[in-house]
Design a protein with these regions (language model features):
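Sec-dependent signal peptide cleavage junction
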Residues: 1-8
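Low-complexity, acidic Ser/Thr/Pro-rich repeat tracts that form intrinsically disordered stalk/linker regions
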Residues: 8-26, 30
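Charged helix-capping and loop-helix junction motifs
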Residues: 119-123, 153-160
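Short, well-ordered secondary-structure micro-motifs
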Residues: 112-113, 151-154
């Protein structure tokens, strides 16, 4: 199987990273077992969820313009950026009806995942920061590096329990 091809049937897809050298993001295709239970059935309403991580970035305004052109909504998992342009992007995401999700304030794995206390501090900072700017009480979180990352010094179950206790849904 070459880069960019998708498997069919009950084959197992392996991790492949797709990186656009001119972009500030990458897509990792994780292990996915495909079987009949996760395939669309005739008559199903098909859905696609668009999510964007690590923003706002230099591409966010263009992404929002394109989404508006096609009347499409997306979820933006953002990090804490204090510059005026980023603050305007947070507001624009919300004002245009998209979902604003948290992706940590600092995005510094070595700090966030060092302890539950550090994770809680970073989480509280991004949640309060986004609320102060947008008035939105964010309830969605995407772990930097994913919920099964290899850099955490703390059992990820502790972080997940904390998010559950905060009524926050996490997504990978």
């Amino acid at each position: 199987q070459s880069k960019g091809e998708m498997s069919t049937g009950t084959e197992l897809q392996t991790d492949t990273e797709y990186q656009d050298q001119n972009a500030d993001s990458s897509i990792v295709q994780s292990l996915v077992a495909e079987d009949e239970s996760n395939k669309a059935q005739p008559g199903d309403q098909l859905k696609v969820y668009l999510t964007f991580d690590d923003g706002p970035s230099s591409n966010t305004a263009a992404i929002l313009d394109t989404l508006a052109q096609y009347n499409v909504k997306a979820t933006f998992f953002v990090v804490g950026k204090e510059d005026e342009e980023s603050q305007e992007m947070y507001k624009r995401i919300v004002n245009e009806g998209h979902t604003l999700g948290m992706h940590s304030y600092s995005h510094k794995y070595s700090v966030i995942y060092d302890s539950l206390e550090n994770f809680e501090d970073d989480f509280t900072k991004i949640q309060n920061y986004l609320y102060d700017i947008t008035g939105e009480d964010c309830h969605y979180y995407r772990f930097p590096g994913g919920s099964s990352n290899q850099v955490s010094n703390t059992d990820m179950k502790e972080f997940i329990k904390y998010l559950n206790d905060q009524d926050v849904t996490y997504f990978d």
